[in-house]
């Protein structure tokens, strides 16, 4: 593998990388991830935590989710001779048409301070089943997401947002678990984020997009990675996205593969463009 990107240090995103790095048949040349050490320098850290070790504390967020004896993800990558780089707005890969459109260093700094506090979020469990039955107007769809607060997780807000453009006029916007503030910041710093094929943030949660943001992004295709509960994906998110494009979800289609080749069995949208 030429490059791997860990968008943020939540267990459902970082966990699989430990297996990859411990697999002798897998070679990763480059690893992109962000940690508080990138933006919190020694003097600031010592004022906040005079009795702690800056490097180990800043990397705690990338500890193994369950194995306390494992190296953290950064040290494990370095021990495997991976080149580890921070990924902030403006970074462009030297050989692959992929660039970082968020977060900026300034946006990430206050989030890094919160991450160091080791804030633990309650796990968002929901075992109800997604359904799109019954009347659901455009007004209802918008209010069901716009009246909700922004995702307050600092790790989600600090997600790396990537833009992949393999050919002209074919763009993929990969939003990780970015929240509304992060996506707004990315849009303000980049002029070419509309009309992309987007990976919808945070499993289609109603706390990570608004109807206004969706209209600004105006995606030509929306893909959600979700288990198909009432919250993930949000019915309101799906409806607002479908004003612009077909909406796909892994809970309906399984693994989704985008290809430029002709296909005989295309994936079935969760909701077709309205």
Description of each model-found segment:
Residues 1-3:
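Short, small-residue-biased leader/transition segments that mark boundaries at the very start
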Residues 205, 210-218, 223-274:
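C-terminal regions of proteins
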Residues 5-24, 113, 140-220, 224-232:
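Active-site-proximal loop/helix segments of hydrolase catalytic cores
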Residues 19-171, 243-246, 250-274:
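Flexible, acidic/histidine-containing loops and adjacent segments that form or flank the divalent-metal
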């Amino acid at each position: 593998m030429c490059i791997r990107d860990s968008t943020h240090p939540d267990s459902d995103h970082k966990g699989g990388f430990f297996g990859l790095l411990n697999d002798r048949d897998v070679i990763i040349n480059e690893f992109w991830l962000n940690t508080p050490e990138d933006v919190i320098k020694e003097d600031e850290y010592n004022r906040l935590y005079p009795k702690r070790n800056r490097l180990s504390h800043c990397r705690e967020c990338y500890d193994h989710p369950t194995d306390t004896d494992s190296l953290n993800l950064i040290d494990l990558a370095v021990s495997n001779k991976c080149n580890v780089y921070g990924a902030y707005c403006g970074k462009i890969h030297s050989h692959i048409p992929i660039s970082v459109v968020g977060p900026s260093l300034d946006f990430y700094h206050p989030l890094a301070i919160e991450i160091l506090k080791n804030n633990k979020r309650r796990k968002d469990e929901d075992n109800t089943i997604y359904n799109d039955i019954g009347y659901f107007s455009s007004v209802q769809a918008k209010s069901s997401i716009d009246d909700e607060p922004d995702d307050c997780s600092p790790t989600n807000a600090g997600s790396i947002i990537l833009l992949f453009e393999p050919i002209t006029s074919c763009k993929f916007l990969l939003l990780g678990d970015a929240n509304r503030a992060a996506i707004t910041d990315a849009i303000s710093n980049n002029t070419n984020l509309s009309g992309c094929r987007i990976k919808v943030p945070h499993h289609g949660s109603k706390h990570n997009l608004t109807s206004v943001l969706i209209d600004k992004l105006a995606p030509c295709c929306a893909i959600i990675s979700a288990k198909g509960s009432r919250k993930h994906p949000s019915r309101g998110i799906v409806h607002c996205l479908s004003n612009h494009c077909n909406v796909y979800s892994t809970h309906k289609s399984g693994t989704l593969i985008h290809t430029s080749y002709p296909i005989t069995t295309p994936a079935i949208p969760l909701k077709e463009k309205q």
